A protein has these predicted regions:
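Conserved, structured core segments of small domains
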Residues: 1-107
Length: 107
């Protein structure tokens, strides 16, 4: 699965979110979970995959344009905006991502 996720990241360098079956998640609000904050490289991907599997989270990745690093996240998908904002704040996130509109929502 690690190699498949790397290939998805290679094909989607600006970012992606997939479920544990590697199907694209295209709707809802993405909230990165704190346990996988600042995960990058192979070691970071392994940690993200383990946490996602253990908790039923989705897996995502995105390119930080400021430092050129590709970050991996285990993510929770929520359908309700207010609930997503509340969880995002609880997780100390500065933003969540709206998959439907393809935009960040700053908290």
């Amino acid at each position: 699965m690690i190699e498949a996720l790397k290939e998805i990241a290679k094909q989607n360098p600006q970012g992606f979110t997939v479920d544990l079956n590697l199907n694209p998640v295209t709707s809802g609000y993405v909230i990165a979970v704190p346990e996988t904050q600042n995960c990058f490289g192979d070691q970071g991907l392994e940690k993200v995959l383990e946490i996602a599997r253990d908790n039923g989270y989705c897996i995502g990745g995105w390119l930080n344009r400021e430092n050129g690093r590709f970050y991996w996240d285990a993510s929770l998908i929520v359908r309700d905006l207010e609930e997503a904002k509340e969880i995002g704040r609880k997780f100390n996130q500065i933003a969540i991502f709206d998959l439907d509109e393809q935009r960040e929502i700053w908290l």
